[in-house]
Amino acid sequence: MRTNKLSILLGNRATGKTIYGKSLIRAALKSGKAVLVVDTFDHPAYAALQRITPDAIADIRPGECVRCYGSDIEAILHGCTNLYNALLVMEDATKYIYGTITDDVKQILFDSKQKNVDVLMMFHSWTACPPAVFRVADNLIIKKTGDNCEVRKKDCPNFAEVYKAWETVERSADKYVTKCVKLQ
């Protein structure tokens, strides 16, 4: 299955971002894609996955589900530029993608379609996700963030739909409520 979508998942702590991400992982594996989970630390939710080094990212095979984590996030992101035919889950991207995005992150984002890579980037808030990421994303998955989506009004394609979804999420009593909006 070839979708090659870049998705942003926004949500505060304990709103179910990782659970949502794991559901996408299951779907990717079912379709035969490889999966790579990237993080800066040994996230307990992914403890069962084999850990690989950044230089092994290019060798991930269809149907494999692995993780790469550590403090040298630059090496990990550079390794991700060699990923093909996979789902790339960027767990807690708030910690390593911010401000002006790096050349490696640009390459990951802009080459994803040619490399058959779906990308899921998880951020804690609207302000934590760089404006450039909003401008190129295909999908926005909204959970409770506690901040206002209007800070990204100029950066979000399809903002009227985004605002409606955000309003629904923030007004809900369900702390796990999720709304998805197609941006492109």
Question: What is the role of each PLM region?
Answer:
Residues 7, 34-36, 64-67, 87:
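Structural motif
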